[in-house]
Design a protein with these regions (language model features):
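Intrinsically disordered, low-complexity terminal regions
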Residues: 1-311
């Protein structure tokens, strides 16, 4: 091998090394960005997974077969993986410091969404797919979701609507409001009011420690419904045609019902005591409704009638 040939081969080898080594580095730089503005084909039913340390997340469903992603971060990086089958965005701090992040994503209806923020609000609307959303400090709104729906916030208001599927909602110190729900519902707070309206479900559980619980919805004759609070009122507004067995208990409050109550002799003596415990049937019975509070009132209204005193 002459000198010229050997030099050529070494040059080619060096070029190959230069070409191959930076490739993953370039890919890494492509993933780690401070700003993203991209539109690309995206399959219906695919996943979106977004996680930020501080900032707002907005995800919206639309009818186009594509995704539009806009993201920016003041300090730090956005680790992004964008494909026709999955969108993954995760923020990383710069030397332990991370600025506010803003993420806006448009996806086809039917996309499944996971979103989390340590400090910031989350809004997911019109995706009509599975949703899992959580925030340590921030309000969350979810409108139009199906299948499995899980939404939790530690310190912030939670609002959800147009839910179709198995729904789990929870807050620690924020109010919880949900309406237009079809499917099983579990809702819980520590110090936030719970309001569930327009519910069509055979299984509902709503529990809080120091706030009121309100339920406006249907009663399935074969269903079960549980409502409890320690220091708030329980207000149920159910159809006049409901068929249910009610089990109501309050220690220092009162029980009020718009439905006729027939008490047995033993029940009359129980009502005379300081604590009040009542069991009665409306319609032909069937569904099991349990409501309890320690220092609040229990109010049972017919659907469409909300003029009974709650204080």
């Amino acid at each position: 091998m002459n000198r010229s040939t050997r030099f050529t081969m070494l040059a080619l080898a060096a070029a190959a090394t230069i070409a191959t080594v930076p490739a993953p580095l370039r890919a890494q730089r492509d993933r780690e960005r401070t700003r993203i503005d991209s539109t690309f084909a995206f399959d219906k039913g695919s996943w979106v997974d977004v996680s930020v340390a501080s900032g707002e997340i907005v995800i919206t469903g639309w009818t186009r077969p594509e995704a539009k992603v806009y993201a920016s971060i003041e300090r730090g990086w956005i680790d992004a993986q964008l494909s026709p089958h999955r969108i993954t965005l995760q923020t990383r701090s710069d030397r332990g410091r991370s600025g506010d992040t803003r993420i806006e994503i448009m996806v086809p209806i039917g996309t499944r969404v996971q979103a989390s923020s340590a400090s910031g609000g989350i809004r997911i609307t019109g995706t009509a797919g599975e949703v899992e959303a959580g925030s340590a400090s921030g309000a969350i709104e979810v409108i139009d979701a199906t299948d499995r729906i899980t939404v939790r916030t530690v310190s912030g208001k939670l609002h959800a609507a147009k839910l179709r599927g198995r729904t789990r909602l929870g807050t620690t110190s924020g109010t919880l409001e949900a309406e237009d729900i079809v499917g099983d519902v579990t809702a819980g707070t520590v110090s936030g009011r719970i309001t569930l309206t327009g519910v069509k479900s055979s299984h509902v559980s709503a529990e809080t420690v120091s706030a009121s619980v309100t339920y406006v919805g249907s009663i399935d004759p074969s269903g079960s419904y549980e409502f409890s609070t320690h220091s708030g009122n329980v207000h149920l507004e159910i159809p006049e045609s409901s068929a249910a067995d009610l089990f109501l208990e309050t220690f220092s409050g009162r029980i009020s019902s718009a439905f006729p109550i027939t008490l047995q002799p033993g029940d009359i003596s129980a009502m005379a005591r300081h604590g009040k415990k009542m069991e009665f049937t409306i319609g032909k019975g069937g569904a099991r409704i349990t409501a309890s509070t320690f220092s609040g009132n229990i109010i049972i209204d017919r659907g469409g009638h909300t003029d009974r005193e709650e204080n």
